């Protein structure tokens, strides 16, 4: 099982960062022309850069990289010290020597001129070979804040235990909600919040509130690898025979490094007979169980550009429908028989197999694709099993509250947690911080202090993307004004939310 969950390589989202100058402003690719500035105070799309790594970091703590903007252009320094975004003139143009420094800071030195990238708090230039504090950049992961941490050394995921008040590195498969964390950024430091809303402190315990004792320095390497420390030489790493995550000064063999991943979505599937789809042997898949077990959990893998999905079990294998047999649980990644086309309808889904027929449940509980057209027996309901809350990020930022507005906003730098209160499969109540509920105005806007719970329908539209159908029958979307609105009849790009 563990072999199947080892990570292979890095994904583009693992290489995306924001770069913060000494003045606390972000390196920004402006929409007009090819101009580069450093005036933005928050991390948005234009402040997100993808690291294109020419060679991996070495023992000298350096790597050779290019920086690519959200528009697909490369950050290019010129001999006169100016910096802009565009297309490289030759194979060497645009490469920087990336060096890693104390407290997680980076410097970027032009490979051609030897000049360091710097900012005066507004403009960006590259005209000095003498290293100073003005050349230091603090990287901030641009990954969604709901994350998992994977240890390549132990081959396990980090797991919080609120009952024991501590954090372990002992989960080979991250299907538990306790494997999900919120990585909060505040004034240059990071706080790790568990799914039970406790914070990891520097004394290795979970505490109820963030403080200086829960603030960590973050070191980031290309490929999404991070290390968290107290800034005085101690780092977090698994310790002892039970792999307790704690601060120490003697990590061995790189055990202080974790791969930062977006928290994956795990679901349960219920058939019309109200039974859970469950793997009951190595091959056999049935909808007979009235109780959830880990063998009823499936990781939802999908591409946002298609309606094709794969359902991965805790064994690391996939559900597959082969020839005229019932569904089995030993499918492989990208195997045609393990790919299903999903259609959504008011919280229910139907699954079309590779043979063009729809998946249904037989009288004895087996799953098989025989129906030419979907009916009630081919409908399934799903529920998120590792998400007690949502942190939604859309086109313009996170969904949250602002002291300057009554309505919920969709352009925030940090999210508000939306507690999910399930009432039916795929139907949830949205509870705001403080115990009140989301309320919907006549104008399609939202306020977070309602007295009564409303029904929201979640539709998964990608591995970590969803659309939300509001109580008024419209999809929730992000508006460029920053206001969250429920007024879209169809699902557009503004209706898709990372979660």
Question: What are the residue ranges of the model-derived segments?
Answer:
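Lectin-like carbohydrate-binding module/patch detector with strong preference for beta-trefoil
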Residues: 1-499
């Amino acid at each position: 099982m563990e072999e199947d969950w080892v990570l292979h390589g890095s994904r583009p989202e693992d290489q995306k960062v924001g770069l913060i100058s000494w003045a606390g402003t972000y390196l920004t690719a402006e929409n007009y022309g090819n101009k580069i500035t450093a005036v933005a105070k928050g991390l948005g799309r234009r402040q997100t850069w993808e690291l294109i790594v020419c060679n991996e970091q070495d023992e000298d703590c350096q790597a050779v990289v290019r920086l690519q903007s959200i528009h697909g252009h490369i950050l290019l320094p010129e001999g006169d010290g100016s910096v802009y975004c565009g297309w490289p003139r030759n194979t060497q143009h645009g490469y920087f020597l990336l060096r890693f420094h104390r407290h997680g800071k980076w410097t970027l030195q032009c490979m051609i001129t030897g000049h360091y990238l710097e900012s005066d708090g507004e403009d960006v230039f590259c005209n000095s070979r003498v290293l100073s504090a003005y050349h230091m950049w603090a990287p901030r992961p641009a990954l969604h804040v709901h994350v998992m941490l994977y240890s390549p050394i132990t081959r396990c995921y980090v797991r919080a235990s609120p009952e024991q008040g501590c954090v372990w590195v002992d989960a080979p498969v991250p299907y538990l909600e306790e494997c999900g964390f919120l990585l909060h950024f505040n004034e240059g430091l990071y706080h790790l919040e568990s799914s039970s809303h406790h914070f990891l402190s520097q004394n290795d315990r979970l505490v109820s509130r963030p403080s200086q004792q829960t603030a960590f320095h973050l070191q980031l390497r290309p490929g999404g690898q991070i290390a968290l420390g107290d800034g005085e030489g101690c780092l977090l790493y698994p310790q002892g025979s039970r792999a307790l995550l704690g601060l120490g000064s003697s990590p061995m063999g790189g055990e202080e490094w974790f791969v930062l991943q977006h928290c994956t979505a795990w679901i349960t599937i219920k058939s019309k007979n109200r039974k859970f789809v469950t793997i009951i042997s190595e091959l056999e898949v049935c909808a007979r169980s009235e109780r959830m077990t880990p063998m009823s959990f499936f990781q939802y893998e999908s591409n946002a550009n298609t309606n094709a999905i794969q359902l991965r079990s805790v064994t690391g294998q996939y559900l597959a429908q082969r020839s005229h047999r019932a569904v089995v649980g030993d499918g492989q990644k990208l195997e045609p028989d393990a790919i299903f086309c999903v259609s959504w309808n008011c919280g229910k889904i139907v699954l079309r197999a590779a043979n063009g027929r729809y998946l249904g449940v037989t009288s004895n509980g087996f799953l098989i694709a025989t129906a030419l057209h979907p009916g009630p027996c081919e409908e399934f309901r799903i529920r998120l099993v590792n998400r007690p809350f949502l942190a939604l990020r859309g086109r313009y930022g996170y969904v949250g509250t602002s002291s300057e507005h009554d309505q919920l906003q969709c352009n925030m730098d940090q999210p508000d947690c939306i507690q999910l209160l399930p009432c039916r499969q795929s139907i949830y109540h949205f509870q705001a911080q403080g115990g009140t509920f989301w309320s919907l105005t006549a104008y399609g806007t939202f306020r977070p202090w309602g007295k009564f719970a409303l029904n929201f329908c979640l539709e998964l539209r990608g591995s970590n993307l969803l659309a939300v159908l509001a109580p008024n029958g419209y999809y929730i979307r992000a508006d460029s004004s920053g206001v969250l609105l429920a007024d879209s009849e169809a699902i557009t790009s503004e209706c898709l939310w990372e979660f």
